[in-house]
Amino acid sequence: MLNKTYTYPTYEAGRHLALKKIQGSIVNLNLIRLKEFADYSDFPDIAPETTISGYEAFMSYIQLAKPFVEQTGGEILLVGKGGRFLIGPENEQWDICMLIKQKSVSDFFAFEQNPDYMKITGHRSASILDSRLLPLEMLSF
């Protein structure tokens, strides 16, 4: 049996997030597993002239996405090299871990639906083998 991979949120997952009615900021925890080589076969208009690694394609995506994140009041808090869990499944590892802060869920959705942002998401798709995205609601303590 093949392991299921995840690269984009489902409609139901987005609906669930919207219905939570989170007030204030969220921080999105992103776990990314990269392809060895980027696959631009579905995105020939933005493909580089030579083959590049999944890492290089993903870093291009981050550089191009950063202004869109910031336009909606968001901030890239961390882009870090992943690896194996200290606590968690021993056979599971992630290449890149990110924390992205957004002012609100609606600002996050506005960022994701920006037509100009959508033009660069091919770099993300070309680079990612699997991913997880967990929106975190800020708690007071």
Describe every region a protein language model picked out.
Residues 1-96, 103, 107, 137-141:
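Short S/T/G/P-rich N-terminal loop/turn motif that feeds into the first structured element of a domain
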Residues 88, 99-101, 105-141:
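Short, Lys/Arg-rich amphipathic alpha-helical interaction segments
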